[in-house]
Amino acid sequence: MLKFNIFRIPVTVHPMFWVFMFLFVAIFAGENATALGITLKVLAFFLSILIHELGHALVARRYGAPVRIDLHGIGGQASYLLPNSTKKKTIIITAAGPLLQLGVAFIALFILAPLAQGTLAAGFIAPFVWISILLAVFNLLPVYPMDGGQILYEALPYNKKKIAFIVGVIVSALGIFVGLIYGQIFLAIFAGLGAWGNYQRLKQG
């Protein structure tokens, strides 16, 4: 288990994170993939997800919350207990993850990538950019508990919270359809889990 601090925030990377990341990348890498290429993509996923959770954690700490980051499975989580929580604070903290992820991706794309052309670093920067953009945009979809779904949930009036789960079911259903049409089984399965989770929350009221 890897443990370290970044900006005085404790980070724990669980062993299964690496297992799932290597399996995920290897499955979609293609027959011409090399061990080095797969490793660079796994490290790109690691840095991108860490930056995402760091966005949440830094803003939460700015509001006075003790924070920590855990990377596990195929994702991560910034844990915090926010004192004097408000809708505005929660929305800002939630949005900070994908926004920081996008910001760093565009810096890498327009500043670092041109400098790294023809070097080994280019094999890391290129996947880091598209991974970060895809993950950030994906996380902003209005499907609870992803960031977009959480933002929608917090933005709605108390008596309209169910709308967030209805939207989540609809968007997830579209994801299932797109996944099946284009043969993206992983997308269809993930969207199916999202649809089921939001349906269960809708039933619970």
For the regions a language model picked out, list residue spans one by one:
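Hydrophobic transmembrane alpha-helices and their immediate loop junctions
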Residues: 1-205
